Regions:
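Beta-propeller-forming repeat regions
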Residues: 1-200
Length: 200
C-alpha cells in the first residue's frame, strides 16, 4: 500500500508511505483470519485468507463498497470488526469524523448501519483537528466488562479528541504531554442498538 502522488493529505513527500492499519478477523466466516484494513488514503480493503490458520495465503487487497461506492473514511484508522449473531459488524471513522457502523452483505460489500451514538444521542467524534490532526484511531469491538455487550476499545494518537473536540480524550482532557492513550467506551445499550458512555 502506497499513497502515490495524491493519496496522502500531508502531501507528496508521503507518496511511498502506506500507514496500513490491519485488523485480523474472520471476515467471510470460513474459520480463517482475514485482514480488514484502513490506510493512508482513508479507503478500506479486505485481504481474504485462502491458506490455513498456520500458513495464511492472502488474496490481493479488494476494496469494500457501500451502495456501489468505495467505503471511505478518515486516514490511518484501523476498523473494528465483530460477529454479532449471524451478522458481521464493521466500525470505521467516517468522512465526517464520526464512528460509523456498517454491516457485511458479502465479501466486498457492506450496508450502512448509521453513526454510533453516545448516551446523549450525539455522534462520537474522533479527531482533534484537520489534516494531520485527523484520523489515526485504532478501533476494536470487545466485551470488556463481560456483560454480553460489545464495547469500544480505542488506540489513540495524541491528536485524537474523543468524543468531541471541546472535552475529549486524550486532547484536551489529558493535555499536550500525552503520546498515545488507550480508551474504553462501554456499550450501555445492546449489540442490536449500541450507545456508548464517555471514554475512560
Amino acid at each position: 500500500v502506497q499513497a502515490g502522488y495524491s493519496g496522502s493529505l500531508q502531501g507528496l513527500q508521503e507518496a511511498r508511505w502506506g500507514y496500513l492499519s490491519p485488523n485480523a478477523f474472520d471476515w467471510n466466516g470460513d474459520g480463517l483470519p482475514d485482514l480488514v484494513t484502513g490506510d493512508i488514503t482513508g479507503d478500506y480493503h479486505v485481504y481474504l485468507n485462502r491458506g490455513t490458520r498456520t500458513e495464511p495465503r492472502l488474496d490481493p487487497a479488494r476494496p469494500l463498497y457501500c451502495d456501489g461506492i468505495n467505503l471511505h473514511g478518515m486516514w490511518r484508522c484501523r476498523p473494528a470488526a465483530a460477529r454479532i449473531g449471524d451478522r458481521v459488524a464493521l466500525v470505521i471513522v467516517d468522512g465526517e469524523d464520526h464512528f460509523h457502523l456498517y454491516w457485511r452483505i458479502d465479501d466486498y460489500n457492506v450496508e450502512d448501519g448509521g453513526k454510533l451514538p453516545q448516551e446523549s444521542g450525539k455522534p462520537i467524534g474522533c479527531s482533534g483537528g484537520v489534516g494531520g490532526k485527523s484520523g489515526r484511531a485504532k478501533l476494536d469491538l470487545f466485551d470488556w466488562n463481560q456483560d454480553g455487550h460489545l464495547d469500544l476499545v480505542i488506540g489513540t494518537n495524541r491528536v485524537n479528541s474523543i468524543p468531541d473536540r471541546a472535552t475529549g480524550l486524550p486532547m484536551p482532557g489529558i493535555g499536550i504531554k500525552t503520546l498515545g492513550t488507550p480508551l474504553l467506551m462501554l456499550n450501555t445499550g445492546t449489540n442490536a442498538k449500541m450507545k456508548f458512555a464517555r471514554p475512560e
